From Swiss-Prot:
Record PTM text: May be hydroxylated on lysine by the viral-encoded procollagen-lysine,2-oxoglutarate 5-dioxygenase.
Organism lineage: Viruses, Varidnaviria, Bamfordvirae, Nucleocytoviricota, Megaviricetes
Glycosylation (residues): 6, 21, 515, 902, 1178, 1192, 1212, 1217, 1245-1246, 1255, 1317, 1422, 1427, 1432, 1443, 1452, 1477, 1494, 1506, 1513, 1533, 1598, 1619-1620, 1632, 1641, 1663-1664, 1672, 1682-1683, 1732, 1735, 1746, 1756, 1784, 1842, 1934
Source species: Acanthamoeba polyphaga mimivirus (APMV)
Protein origin, superkingdom: Viruses
Name the record gives this protein: Collagen-like protein 7
CC per GO annotation: virion component
Keywords, comma-separated and alphabetical: Collagen, Glycoprotein, Hydroxylation, Repeat, Virion
Known function: May participate in the formation of a layer of cross-linked glycosylated fibrils at the viral surface thus giving it a hairy-like appearance.
Keyword Repeat on entry: yes
Localization (cell): Virion
Length: 1937
């Protein structure tokens, strides 16, 4: 069993036994005590051989066994499952697993050649293997010792400069500097925005009209009165007969509408045309269409804020942003720490693995490859890297993709900060510029008056505002609640109309007048029966404009089809009201003024309208018909112009008038109110002029503004001065990028990109010694993020070079026997050198291109950490190189230090120092495990190589060849190289020569068989030839294994870099002899291996010692038996046989071949070359006629075939008569009939019949001119087919169940009979033909092509039937009524129709409808399905009752999809484009609606949606409108001008995205939730009454998340507002108890508008952003940074504001907001303040770095408490009877006080109280203590402080009270007066008390010498001569005026 072949057990190690024959099983018990042994034998191994860990290969089965716990375990190889050779060949993936052994396989490949013995003869490189095994590697092992120092390299990881990268993050603060630019007063500007609402007040004037509007609301009801007028039209209906006057109606102006510019031939002079796409209104004059106006309201008003845009000046500050960019990298540095994981990431580089191909250079390790042969398998390892593809490794160059580190550049996403340039839009931030207005605000306390302008809005309530009514109305009309009174007015209106109604009677004649367009008014959507086609209808509640069109957008359609049962089917599309546009522009704020609409009550007078009964007088209405004329002009209409009922449009204002009783009455402004959205226009002010930001210096003027308390904010303007620097930013257009820097904050997101920076952390890679883990590093492949390559620096791990130990895996190369292919892989071993490749991380430098990010490079310093990648290098060995791309970043050459890794060979060497330990080299025997070391290539484990004591790992030193990676060393530029110093460790190795013992390891080589696995990878770039590793591993020539199946011949690998000549290892089994390695030291001549299969010819290795002549190959197997030879030539004719007996049963012709025999009972045998049947009894074959000739009228006698019920009847057949065929018969001919069941009938039928009357028959033929092809009734299971023309019929009989009918019919019919269940009719029907199943044909199918008024249908009540087909040219496809569960699959074009009849429950339509065609689902077709496309003015219609149904359809090119009737639990999936219109009516409970509207497509849901789900997409000016939804889920996407407008929504959820001017807005909303994303000028929100709802989302790029609903109580709005976007509560009335929170950045705004009482706003405001509430009892708090603002608006009494304000930020209440409270922290030029005139308010907080805590001007009775730092901060109380407590305080109001250090007081009756303490005795003997007193004058200040000479800057006087407390317990109280007159100071101590001394303590103590001296123009001093130290306390009372 045990076959000790030459390759079986060959050991050169003295401690191992070398078996050379098969008889020594008993001596095999312990072949080698220190290492596992490999046995090769035939059959299952005996349990008596081997020891724990030994391997046994059954040469017969190629199954490996491992001895575990005394038992041979099958299929275990080095703790891995082994595969069968075929498996290996068949599953390259498994190869991947064993890739470790794969390297051996590499040898195997060459080994194949070894099998050739050719190279084997060359001295059996195995001898060289001997060297490999021992000493050579041992030498390398010595170097390994230094490798131990490599571990110190791990300490290098501590050197993580990456941490410094964190400092780079500080650079991010630089970004904040960018924000500083925004810091411009722009924040105050936001208050200026409040001023903008003042402008809205202007609109309020219109609002006055709004008051009327309120009436208008009532008026709307009044409009209903108008509807009453329509009632008159109804009367006209009665009079309609008189239509003659209607002709005059024709004279009336028609309003036409369409999509696009009107056609010149459309309409007549005086007509109007409305372009539904643009809302442009045209009038026809002299035959030409002239644009008159645009019905859309203007939004422009808000553009005023655009003025604010000027603040862009501060944008200049953006220059700092440039610095910030560096900061970004700093951030990345932090992530760099994470980079440690990045080590794995290095493998991520491997992800580039093609790049690893570069590691393929490691292929140089291939020299190890001599071991490398195993290395070939290693190539598999490459596969691990996919390295075989290592050439792909060149892709490794792609590894430059590692540049993904460039992703760090993604940090450049900070560049998105460049988007921050959009930050330049931040210039829109110029809205902050509004802040500039805010600067005015500075003055703008007065500006606050602007806020009063808001009060002006109250003015809006003024009736005068009424003019605005019409525009703003409607929405504000919500206020129209008062308008309810107006409702009475409505009645009045009706009355008026009613009178006209009388005229309406004549209007009846006006029916012709209908040609004139009527404009109707009403509340809510129009009733379907209201108005005529062409009329317009205005919903006064929503200002929605509807037009009445017929269902097909043209004439009514009437389609009829004649069915075989003569049933008439009529389809008619009646006029439908289609929403055209909304006359109102954005509902402007002015709507608020609409409140005054109460006056609308005057409409009550309209009550007389109840006289509508007079409508009979409507005859006069005939004239009224003319009244329908629409006039237009500029300005108000002339009283003499027009007649009652006429309409007049003022083209200047858009005001619409109606003439009533001879007076022009304004009714509505067809132009919508200018919406508040105009405010966004402010953003438009991009104020790119922001460069004017230099004007920010005007902010300095803001200092002047200080006169205005807000002027303090002007101080912030000083920062604006920095903005001047920002002007440099102008230069810095790049600086603008700096602006991006602002966004750069977001750029922090970029940090993710910075992950590349993580590479920096890679420096931690120094830990690379951990590289042992590098194995895991392979997982790192995912780490491609590592590509950020900065990580590449990890190259430091180069120490992994130790991994070279893995080279020991080369031992596996023995297995290489199998992997002959592996030879090429040898080069792959050089890949080991790839470890140096870690330097390849330099490739990271490629990232430097990213450096464009600039600052980020700074982070690169962190990159030194990247050395970690070095660990990877081990792994890579193939693809790690890909990291090179990263190199650019890493330039740190330090990585080259990785080359030191070559020293790794020395791995063992470290222990070598212990030379004595070399004995441990025995452990090296374990080195065989080193084979696993190949896995070690992952390198990090290589560090474990230190255990190199096992010396065998020293063999891994071969891996040192990885030094090749050094090519990548480019990255090494990083200087981190220092890690390289570790390399020096190599020197120590020299001692380690002991290692030679390791050579024994060769035994492992057996595993090499596995090597076959590695398909020869693509030839990787030839890695730099690594240090020639000790070749020895190749050494032990394994016993020549049983000649394995010739391993899959891998691709011939590139000739591996010839590894260093290894120590002469034990002569390995010859098989390994694959690649001829460098000629190693001549090893012991190995046993002559069995001649292996001839491998591919390997690269010619250095000529090895001449190997033993291989054994003669086995004799080939006997070839398979050859193919049967060709048939031999025919033999000679045999002799004629004897004459036989004469036969009586056979007749033979003289030719000997023609014969007839009847020798067998019952059979006649004929042998002849031809046959004839004669018709005459004389047997002559020459007689005519031919029995088959038509002239044969007597037929052919077939009686001989007349078997009972046989195939043919008895008798003669003629050519024209084949009738009456019996049962089981067949008939062929003309006009044929078969009567027998199971018959077959074929024929040609001219106006007659081809038929079968029996079951299971088949009938076919041609029927023409009324001919019939059929099976008769009862012919179940029959088939009828053919061609039926000119009224021909192809049919089965009635009740012919399971039958089939098919064919072609032109004007004919193809049908199954009635009741023909489970039947099928198919074919083509043309020219009025019919393809159908009969009525009641359950489970039947009809399919075909219907053209030319033809019909494809199932019969009535044909349940579960199916129709499939195509209908064209008025073709019809339909299922009959009651055809439940039927199915139609069809296409209809050219005015064709596809229909499911009434009551077709559970049916389905799948079809295409084009060119004016119709798809229709009949009423009560519940549970049905329609999947269809409606195109080119076609229509898809359902009637009522399609509950539980599903409609999936597309409407295109003005196609119409209309769903009417209640649909419960149904599903609708639509796409409406190119003017397509989808309308869903009635109620849809529990349904699902999914749709997309594009290119002016419209989806309208008219009915209520209860518990319904709607998902829609609207783009390109398209829209989705939903009337009412309860408990529903509405989701939509509105882009490119698209809109998604749910109507009344209660308890519903609305989610969506609005982009590119898209709009998602709901109307009345209660208890709903609106969620979404608004981008690029889009809007998301609610615009009508709303209660208890929630809006949340993300708004970017001038977008808005809003609620501009009236009465939005108890609601919540939340989200993220960025880049001039707004999260906005724009409720005009009673928006109480709302909650607003979010994040606002880059001029973003979070705002609760006016009258939001009890509101709560909170969040973060950055970069000229603001968080605002306006309403009593509100609360606002958050974080305000970079000129951002947190505040409440004007007149917001009793509010609470708090937070943190930084970098010019402001926390404030609005002006005139008494009893408010402000608290917070103010830093870097920020403000915490109340607004002006905020009486009885409080401010408290902390202010530092030139920040301010103050009450506003004239904020009487207020309190300011806090702490201010010493750098010029100010804590002030600016109103009367106010109080300031803290440091650097001011009490600037009369009767106020300030207490604290550096206190100020400057008004009558005020005081400042201050104290100080001086341990140096400020008033000791001989010293003077200066008391600084700043004089008093109205508006100035008094200061008491411990400064230099006290002065009074202004003329005036005051009393000073001082208490001096001495250190000895004495005290002195004194008083004096100081006066300044004309710049000269005098001091006047009072006479009483004497000298000003008020008292002494203790009493009786002598008064110290005291002098108070005026210093002329310098102030005054107090001199106290005493030996004590004094503490002083001062009070000053000011008396001057």
């Amino acid at each position: 069993m045990l076959d000790m072949m030459n390759n079986s057990l060959s050991y050169n190690r003295p401690e191992c036994i070398n078996f050379q024959n098969n008889s020594v099983q008993k001596n095999v018990i312990r072949v080698c005590e220190n290492e596992p042994n490999t046995f090769v034998g035939s059959g299952i191994p005996s349990q008596i051989i081997g020891k724990q860990g030994d391997i046994y290969l059954d040469r017969i089965t190629r199954i490996y066994y491992k001895k575990i716990n005394g038992v041979w375990v099958k299929n275990v190889c080095n703790n891995h499952r082994c595969c069968y050779p075929k498996e290996c060949k068949g599953n390259p993936h498994t190869k991947g697993e064993k890739g470790e052994t794969g390297p051996k396989g590499i040898k195997g490949e060459k080994g194949d050649r070894g099998l050739k013995g050719e190279k084997g003869n060359n001295g059996d490189p195995g001898e060289k293997g001997e060297k490999g095994a021992k000493g050579d590697k041992g030498e390398s092992g010595e170097k390994g010792a230094k490798g131990d120092k490599g571990d110190k390299g791990d300490i290098g990881e501590k050197g993580e400069k990456g941490d410094k990268g964190d400092i780079g993050e500080k650079g991010e603060k630089g970004d904040k500097g960018d924000i500083g630019e925004k810091g411009d007063k722009g924040d105050l500007g936001e208050k200026g925005e409040k001023g903008d609402p003042g402008q809205k007040g202007e609109k309020g004037d219109k609002g006055d009209f709004g008051d009327k509007g309120d009436k208008g609301d009532i008026g709307e009801k009044g409009d209903k009165g108008d509807i009453g007028d329509k009632g008159e039209i109804g009367n006209k209906g009665d009079v309609g007969e008189k239509g003659s006057k209607g002709d005059k109606g024709i004279d009336g102006t028609s309003i036409l509408f369409g999509f696009g510019i009107p056609s010149p031939d459309l309409g007549v002079d005086g007509d109007l045309y409305l372009d539904a796409n643009t809302d442009e209104l045209y009038g026809k004059v002299n035959g030409q269409w002239i644009p008159i106006t645009n019905l859309k309201g203007e939004k422009g008003d808000k553009g005023n804020k655009g003025i604010d845009g000027e603040k862009g000046n501060k944008g200049d500050t953006g220059d700092k942003g440039i610095d910030g960019s560096k900061g970004d990298k700093g951030d990345t540095g932090n992530k760099g720490d994470i980079g440690d994981k990045g080590d794995q990431g290095i493998k991520g580089d491997i992800g580039d693995k093609g790049e690893k191909g570069d590691i393929g250079e490691k292929g140089d390790k291939g020299e190890k490859g001599i071991k490398g042969d195993k290395g070939d398998i290693g190539e598999k390892g490459n596969k691990g890297d996919i390295g075989d593809k290592g050439e792909k490794g060149d892709k490794g160059i792609d590894g430059d993709k590692g540049i993904k580190g460039d992703k760090g550049d993604i940090g450049e996403k900070g560049d998105k900060g460049d988007i921050g340039e959009k930050g330049n839009k931040g210039e829109k931030g110029d809205k902050g510029d509004k802040g500039d207005i805010g600067e005015k605000g500075d003055k703008g306390d007065t500006g606050s008056k602007g806020d009063k302008g808001d009060k002006g809005e109250k003015g809006d309530k003024g009736d005068k505002g009424e003019k605005g009514d019409i525009g703003d109305k409607g929405e504000k009309g919500d206020k129209g609640d008062k308008g309810d009174k107006g409702d009475k007015g409505d009645k009045g209106d009706k009355g008026d109309t009613g009178d006209k109604g009388d005229k309406g009677d004549k209007g009846d004649k006006g029916d012709k007048g209908d040609n004139g367009t009527s404009i109707l008014f009403g509340s809510g959507p129009p009733s379907p029966d209201l108005g005529m086609v062409g009329d317009l209808y205005i919903d006064v509640t929503t200002d929605e404009l509807y037009g009445k069109v017929n269902a097909k957008m043209n004439d009514n359609i009437r389609v009829s089809a004649k069915v075989n049962v003569n049933k008439q089917i009529t389809l008619q599309a009646t006029g439908q009201w289609i929403p055209l546009t909304n006359l109102k522009g954005d509902k402007g704020d002015k709507g608020i003024n609409g409140n005054k609409g109460d006056k609308g009550e005057k409409g009550d007078k309209g009550n007389p309208g109840t006289n509508a009964g007079k409508g009979e007088k409507g005859d006069k209405g005939d004239k009224g018909d003319a009244g329908t004329s629409i006039l237009f002009g500029q300005g108000a209409p002339d009283p003499n112009q027009g007649v009652d009922g006429d309409i007049y449009i003022d083209t200047l204002t858009g005001e619409l008038y109606r003439k009533v009783n001879g007076l022009w009455v304004p009714e509505i402004d067809i132009k919508g109110d200018k919406g508040e959205k105009g405010d966004k226009g402010n953003a438009g002010d991009k104020g790119t002029s922001g460069e004017k930001g230099d004007l920010g210096s005007k902010g300095e003027k803001g200092d002047t503004g200080e006169k205005g308390d807000k002027g303090n904010k002007g101080d912030r303007g000083d920062k604006g001065i920095k903005g001047d620097i920002g002007s440099k930013g102008d230069k810095g257009d790049i600086g603008n990028k700096g602006d991006k820097g602002d966004r750069g904050d977001k750029g922090i997101k970029g940090d993710a990109g910075l992950k590349g920076d993580k590479g920096d952390i890679g420096q931690k890679g120094d830990k690379g010694t951990k590289g042992d883990r590098g194995d895991k590093g392979e997982k790192g492949d995912a780490g491609l993020k590592g590509n950020k390559g900065d990580i590449g620096l990890k190259g430091d791990k180069g120490t992994k070079g130790d991994r070279g130990d893995k080279g020991t895996k080369g031992d596996r190369g023995d297995k290489g026997d199998i992997g002959n292919k592996g030879d090429k892989g040898d080069k792959g071993t050089k890949g080991d050198r790839g470890d140096k490749g870690v330097k390849g991380d330099k490739g990271d430098k490629g990232n430097k291109g990213d450096k464009g990010n600039i600052g980020i490079k700074g982070d690169k310093g962190d990159r030194s950490d990247k050395g970690l990648k070095g660990d990877k290098g081990d792994k890579g060995d193939t693809g790690d190189i890909g990291l090179k791309g990263d190199k650019g970043d890493i330039g740190e050459k330090g990585i080259k230090g990785d080359k030191g890794i070559n020293g790794s060979k020395g791995y063992k060497g470290d222990k070598g120092d212990k030379g004595s330990k070399g004995d441990k080299g025995n452990k090296g025997d374990k080195g065989s495990k080193g084979d696993k070391g190949d896995i070690g290539i992952k390198g990090s484990k290589g560090d474990k190589g230190d255990k190199g004591d096992k010396g065998s790992k020293g063999d891994k030193g071969d891996i040192g060849s990885k030094g090749d990676k050094g090519d990548k060393g480019d990255i090494g530029t990083k200087g981190d190289k220092g890690t390289k110093g570790d390399k020096g460790i190599k020197g120590d190795i020299g001692s380690k020569g002991d290692k030679g013992s390791k050579g024994d390891k060769g035994s492992k080589g057996d595993k090499g068989d596995i090597g076959s696995k590695g398909d020869k990878g693509d030839k990787g770039d030839k890695g730099s030839k690594g240090d020639k590793g000790s070749k020895g591993i190749k050494g032990d020539k394994g016993d020549k294994g049983t000649k394995g199946d010739k391993g899959i011949k891998g691709d011939k690998g590139d000739k591996g870099i010839k590894g260093d000549k290894g120590d002469k290892g034990d002569k390995g089994d010859k098989g390994i002899k694959g690649d001829k390695g460098d000629k190693g030291d001549k090893g012991d001549k190995g046993d002559k291996g069995t001649k292996g299969d001839k491998g591919d010819k390997g690269d010619k290795g250095s000529k090895g010692d001449k190997g033993d002549k291989g054994d003669k190959g086995d004799k080939g197997e006997k070839g398979s038996k050859g193919d049967k030879g060709d048939k031999g030539d025919k033999g000679d004719k045999g002799d004629k046989g004897d004459k036989g007996d004469t036969a009586t049963c056979e007749i033979v012709n003289t030719d000997g071949q023609t014969r007839v025999s009847a020798c067998n009972t019952g059979f006649v045998k004929i042998e002849a070359s031809g046959y004839e049947i004669t018709t005459a009894p004389n047997g002559s074959s020459d007689l005519a006629p031919d029995p088959f000739d038509p002239s044969n009228v007597s037929g052919m006698n077939t009686k001989l075939f007349g078997i009972q019920n046989g195939a043919f009847r008895s008798g003669n057949f003629t050519a024209t008569n084949l009738s009456d065929i019996g049962q089981y018969s067949a008939v062929f001919g003309y006009q044929t009939t078969a009567t027998g069941s199971g018959s077959i009938v074929y024929g040609i039928n001219n106006s007659s019949g081809i038929s079968s009357g029996s079951n299971g028959s088949l009938v076919g033929g041609l029927a023409n001119t009324g001919g019939i092809i059929r099976s008769f009734s009862g012919a179940e299971g029959s088939i009828a087919f053919g061609s039926s023309e000119i009224n021909g019929i192809i049919t089965t009989g009635f009740g012919a169940q399971g039958s089939i009918v098919g064919g072609y019919s032109s004007g004919g019919t193809i049908a199954t009979g009635s009741g023909a269940n489970a039947s099928e009719a198919f074919g083509q029907a043309t020219t009025g033909s019919l393809i159908t199943t009969g009525p009641g044909a359950i489970g039947s199918s009809t399919r075909g092509y219907s053209v030319g008024n033809s019909v494809i249908t199932t019969g009535l009540a044909s349940w579960a039937s199916q129709i499939t087909g195509y209908a064209s040219n008025s073709g019809i496809i339909f299922s009959g009524s009651g055809t439940s569960t039927s199915d139609i699959i069809a296409s209809v074009t050219d005015s064709s129709t596809l229909t499911i009849g009434d009551g077709s429950i559970g049916s389905s339509i799948r079809g295409y409808c084009s060119s004016g065609s119709l798809i229709s689902l009949g009423p009560n077709s519940n549970g049905s399905i329609i999947n269809a496309t409606v195109n080119n003015f076609s229509t898809l219609i359902t009637s009522s009752g399609v509950n539980g149904s599903s409609i999936v359809a597309r409407a295109n090119n003005s196609g119409l999809i209309s769903i009417s009737g209640n649909c419960f639990g149904s599903q609708f999936v639509f796409n409406s484009i190119n003017g397509g219109n989808i309308t869903i009516g009635s109620t849809h409970a529990g349904s699902q609606i999914v749709g997309s509207a594009n290119t002016s497509g419209i989806i309208t849901v008219v009915g209520g949606l209860n518990g319904t789900l709607v998902a829609a997409n609207s783009s390109s000016t398209s829209g989705v409108r939903i009337s009412t939804s309860f408990g529903s889920l509405l989701a939509g996407n509105a882009t490119t001008g698209g809109w998604f407008r749910p109507g009344q929504a209660q308890g519903s959820v609305i989610a969506g995205q609005a982009s590119a001017s898209g709009v998602i807005l709901t109307a009345f909303n209660a208890g709903c939730n609106v969620i979404g994303y608004a981008n690029r000028g889009s809007t998301l929100g609610i615009n009508q009454n709303a209660f208890g709802y929630s809006v949340m989302g993300y708004a970017d790029l001038n977008s808005t998340i809003t609620s501009n609903a009236l009465g939005a109580n108890a609601c919540r709005i939340m989200g993220y507002a960025l880049n001039n976007s707004t999260i906005f509560m724009d409720s005009l009335v009673a928006a109480n108890a709302t909650d607003l929170f979010g994040y606002a950045n880059n001029s973003g705004v979070i705002q609760a508008a006016d009258q939001c009482a009890g509101a709560l706003a909170r969040g973060v405001a950055q970069n000229n952003s603001s968080i605002v509430t306006r309403g009593n009892g509100s609360m606002t708090f958050g974080f305000s940074n970079n000129n951002s603002t947190i505040f409440t608006g004007q007149f917001s009494d009793g509010c609470f504001v708090g937070g943190y304000a930084n970098s010019g930020g402001t926390i404030s209440t609005g002006s005139t907001s008494p009893a408010s409270h402000v608290f917070g922290f103010s830093n870097s030029g920020s403000f915490i303040t109340t607004g002006n005139n905020t009486n009885a308010s409080t401010v408290f907080g902390y202010a530092t770095a030139n920040s301010t805590i103050t009450t506003g001007a004239n904020s009487n009775g207020s309190l300011a408490v806090g702490y201010t730092g010493s750098s010029g901060e100010l804590l002030g109380a600016l109103g009367q009877t106010s109080f300031a407590i803290g440091r650097n305080n001011t009490a600037s109001g009369a009767y106020s006080g300030a207490i604290g250090i550096s206190s100020y007081a400057n008004m009558e009756g005020s005081f400042a109280h201050s104290s100080f303490q001086d341990t140096v005795n400020p008033v000791s003997a001989g010293r003077s203590q200066n008391i600084k007193v700043m004089g008093r004058k109205v508006g100035t200040q008094i200061v008491l402080a411990n400064g230099s000479y006290a002065t009074l800057p202004y003329d005036g006087y005051g009393d000073v009270f001082a208490r001096l407390i001495g250190s000895s317990g004495t005290a002195v109280g004194l008083t004096f007066q100081v006066t300044r007159t004309a710049g000269t100071y005098t001091v006047a101590p009072p006479i009483t008390p004497s000298g000003g001394i008020l008292w002494l303590s203790p009493s009786g103590v002598a008064a110290p010498p005291l002098a108070i001296t005026a210093l002329g123009t310098s102030g005054f001093t107090i001199t106290l001569t005493d030996a004590q130290n004094y503490n002083c306390y001062f009070d000053i009372v000011n008396y001057s005026s």
